[in-house]
Amino acid sequence: MTYQIEITLKPFARGFHLITDEIVSKLPDFTGIVHVFIQHTSASLTINENADPSVRVDFETHFNKLVSESDDHYTHTLEGKDDMTSHIKSSILGSSISFPIKNGIPQLGTWQGVYLCEHRNRASGRKIFVTCIGGS
């Protein structure tokens, strides 16, 4: 069985946002692999700890220091100082994630969740494309 769906997420503020429930609520009851791909170049996806909200703050702080908007050497800034830095952060974190699912239940670790990493100061709703491969 192969199942695909496009999900348009609501607009999020800059930062790291848990979207596990938005994805899982749209999945069929099956066993296999879920692949999630974001159709944008200035946002990314990751799987990480979902229990302590300070993790999200620390992620944002770290990536803002690693790829600073205060650097004036970027030339791709047509849409603002967060333009090129968003592309770099997206390249570092990646545009897709995968996780196993068993009988409709994601087999993520106890403290794992799927994050939308929004790198822009202002962004519209992001589109993710979800592919499920497996059987019932």
Please report, for each region that a protein language model flagged, where it lies by residue:
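Active-site histidine-anchored catalytic micro-motif
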Residues: M1-S136
